[in-house]
Each structure stands twice: as structure tokens, then as C-alpha cells.
């Protein structure tokens, strides 16, 4: 039972198993929700089949359960939400808030990577075209509950970004906003690598006339080369053995109170301790390099 209107979520993509960096995002969002006696949901962001690894989604859910991170309600699968995305696209089109773009990627690269609105007034049809938002509400800054006021790159914030890809796939920024609104998410706790797209997502909330959630961007776990731990750079999967030492590592990474007697606790007791003593203000804002992160699963 909860007595709070707080709703948080963890939304991994099934491009591989969870690693230590994933655990930081999952644990941070879980603790922030549970400390406020709120709801914590899980969503599988499986809208990009070329990047998905067969069986990864089921493994991710097993990993969360193994680490004691039990979610509320049913898992939401983006692959089952296409109709909702189509309805959102149709509404934007009807309101004159989107347009078709046939510009090749090479042209945008020549512009320095920021689209210049070339197709905005050309009235292209849908054939072999992407759909771009007609930016009406650029967001130049936003408040992060951990980091304070974050300023956006003005060019990035003002860009007419893609919401439906030329290959027929729904863009991440559209899907995440539609789903967070649908699930009633009140605060999004995720990694700092997602700070940049936040202003685009906030502008979509304004386009739709929806209330936006709050944001917390956690520090990233880096490998010994200074790169973010990720599935793309082959970060090792989380341990399938005793999850407690890895949870303790993750809590230390998040700047939380040390669990001195964790060996005497069950996973459930360890997490209850972490919820009771959770302090968002103790979380560092800088990324952290530690060789142990690369070995957290070994």
C-alpha cells in the first residue's frame, strides 16, 4: 500500500543484460520512490528491434527480482503501445504541430548536426519521410532535483526534432513522453547521459498540453577508460550470485549511509535499510571511475 501520489519508473531497453551502471539507475529510482511511499513501475522500451537482444527483456526482469527490486503493477511494453504512439502522431499532425521531412542524414551532418527546418513549409507527403515536431515551445532550461537549474544548448532546444523515423520506427522522445504521461509518472530518476534529451521531452509535454514530471539525473558509473558503463562497450552483466555486496557497492556509489552489518541482513532487510536512510542530497553529481565497477558482476 502507498499513501503518496509519487510515481516513479525504471525503463530499460532490452539491448542486453543489466550491468552495474543500469543498477545505479534502477536502485536510485526505486529508493526515491519507496522513500516517499510511492509507486515504482517498470517499462521495457522495446521499440527499436534492430538494437534488441533476444531474451534480454526476460533476463532484465529476472535480474531486477534477484536484486530485490520488485515493481508495482504490470510491466508496460512499448512494443504493445504502437496504437497510442500513432494516435499521438495523428493529433500533432491535425494540430499543425508536425511535418514530414525528406532531408537525408548527410545534409544534416553538413549543417553540423542541427536541423535547420528546411522541410517545414514544403508540404511533403509521408512517402520515404520522417516526421518532425514543429517546435512551438522550446525549453531553454529545467530544474533537476539533484543538480539544480540546467541550461540547454539553445540550438538543440529550438530544433524541430524527429518523432517518427523514416524507417517507420517511433522515436524515443515521442514514446517516452506518451508512456510517462500514460503511466502517471510524477518524477523521472535516470542517468545523467539523458540530460540532453530532457528539454526535447519537456517541449513535447508543452505541445500536448500535459503536465510534465520532475527530473533527477544520477551520476554515471564509468569504466577504467573513463567511458560510461554500457551494453555497447561490453560492461559485464550483474552477478547471478549473492546480490548484497553489489547492492552495497551501488549504495556507496550513490553516496548513501554505509550498511555496516549487511552480511547479517537479507536482501529485503538491506533494501528496507536503504529506503529508510535514503537521502537524495547525499548523491554526488559527478561521474565516478572505479575499477570495481567493471568487476561488479564477477
From Swiss-Prot:
Binding site for ATP: 231
The record's free-text note on cofactor binding: Binds 1 zinc ion per subunit.
GO molecular function: ATP binding; glutamate-tRNA ligase activity; zinc ion binding
Enzyme Commission numbers on file: 6.1.1.-
Motif ('HIGH' region) on chain: 12-22
The keyword Metal-binding appears for this protein: yes
Reported function: Catalyzes the tRNA-independent activation of glutamate in presence of ATP and the subsequent transfer of glutamate onto a tRNA(Asp). Glutamate is transferred on the 2-amino-5-(4,5-dihydroxy-2-cyclopenten-1-yl) moiety of the queuosine in the wobble position of the QUC anticodon.
Family that this chain belongs to: Belongs to the class-I aminoacyl-tRNA synthetase family. GluQ subfamily.
Record NCBIfam families: PRK05710.1-1, PRK05710.1-3, queuosine_YadB
The protein's name in its UniProt record: Glutamyl-Q tRNA(Asp) synthetase
Organism per entry: Salmonella paratyphi A (strain AKU_12601)
Gene that encodes the chain: gluQ
